[in-house]
């Protein structure tokens, strides 16, 4: 929980925690908040993220624990019709994509549909206003409470999608009750 933590300082802390408490997982929330060594004199953030990414991979191997690194997406996803995130949407991503053994992306279509709510019909409105809102509501009902966990990269396995139940009130993801709706191979 230290802003501006360098990858070297993170490594030192993780080693100490492993030695004292036998940690089994390192979580970085989020990757772009870490800093490199500062040796990048030209201020190239992509190169700095590459250094951080390699450092996290080395840390995982050294401590023999998984490192879960959260990352921001670039804004490119917002300019597409299909808002499902892709590997290329990872901000400053070339090395993240290359170094990671697995990349998981979350997608909630409900989030985007909610942002497109048409005018709510009021008495006296044209039939089209009622129809547009009814179509929107049906589309929202179709995806309400459902999210996708996209396995975009898995070095030692297959990729695809897993549908999950999303409970916004608690920001909680869980299995869907109906197992037949869960998996989607792409």
Per-segment meaning from a language model:
Residues 23-69:
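Helical hairpin unit composed of two closely spaced alpha helices linked by a short loop
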Residues 5-25, 54-63, 76-186:
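C-terminal regions of RecA-like/P-loop NTPase motor modules
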Residues 1-4, 35-50, 77-88:
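Flexible beta-alpha connector loops of hexameric P-loop NTPases
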């Amino acid at each position: 929980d230290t802003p501006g933590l360098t990858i070297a300082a993170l490594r030192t802390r993780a080693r100490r925690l492993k030695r004292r408490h036998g940690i089994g997982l390192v979580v970085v929330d989020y990757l772009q908040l870490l800093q490199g060594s500062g040796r990048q004199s030209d201020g190239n953030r992509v190169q700095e993220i590459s250094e951080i990414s390699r450092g996290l991979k080395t840390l995982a191997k050294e401590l023999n624990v998984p490192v879960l690194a959260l990352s921001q997406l670039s804004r490119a996803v917002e300019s597409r019709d299909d808002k499902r995130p892709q590997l290329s949407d990872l901000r400053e991503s070339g090395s993240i994509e290359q170094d990671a053994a697995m990349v998981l992306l979350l997608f909630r279509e409900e989030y985007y549909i909610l942002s497109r709510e048409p005018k709510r019909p009021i008495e006296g409105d044209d039939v089209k206003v009622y129809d547009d809102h009814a179509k929107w509501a049906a589309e929202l009902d179709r995806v309400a409470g459902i999210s996708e966990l996209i396995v975009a990269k898995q070095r030692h396995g297959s990729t695809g999608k897993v549908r999950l139940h999303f409970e916004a009130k608690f920001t909680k993801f869980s299995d869907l009750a109906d197992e037949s709706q869960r998996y989607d191979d792409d």
